[in-house]
């Protein structure tokens, strides 16, 4: 069966998440329900809620429309609220994304260049 509609355009993120699982303390991961938060949803939340970018600025950084950014924010926030209120684990995985090349990523813009894989390869 072929897929119809427009192909999904990858969203740009600055880096892979440092941690992929968050869960309630004192409970095994196998004992709790899980919420899947996509990497691009996390990036949208990071840019708007944590770094205080406007939705317009964040959408430009991610290479998406404001409407798509709004959808990512809405879904991501809903999933995080569900996990916090109902004691579920948050698993960060999936999504349509690409890591932005050095020179555009947030760390590079703030002068921290040694993190970049391409920078390390030049040494």
Swiss-Prot record:
Pfam families: DUF134 (PF02001). InterPro entries: RNA_pol_sigma_r3/r4-like, UPF0251, WH-like_DNA-bd_sf. Coiled coil: none annotated. Gene3D superfamilies: Winged helix-like DNA-binding domain superfamily/Winged helix DNA-binding domain. It comes from the Archaea. Disulfide bonds: none annotated. Belongs to the UPF0251 family. This is UPF0251 protein MJ1243. The lineage of its organism: Archaea, Methanobacteriati, Methanobacteriota, Methanomada group, Methanococci.
């Amino acid at each position: 069966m072929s897929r119809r509609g427009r192909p999904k355009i990858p969203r740009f993120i600055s880096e892979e998440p440092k941690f992929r699982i968050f869960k309630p303390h004192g409970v095994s991961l196998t004992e709790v329900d899980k919420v899947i938060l996509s990497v691009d949803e996390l990036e949208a939340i990071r840019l708007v809620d944590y770094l205080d970018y406007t939705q317009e600025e964040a959408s430009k950084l991610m290479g998406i429309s404001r409407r798509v950014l709004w959808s990512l924010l809405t879904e991501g926030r809903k999933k995080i609220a569900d996990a916090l209120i109902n004691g579920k684990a948050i698993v960060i995985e999936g999504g349509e994304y690409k890591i932005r090349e050095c020179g555009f990523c947030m760390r590079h813009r703030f002068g921290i260049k040694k993190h970049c894989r391409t920078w390390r390869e030049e040494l």
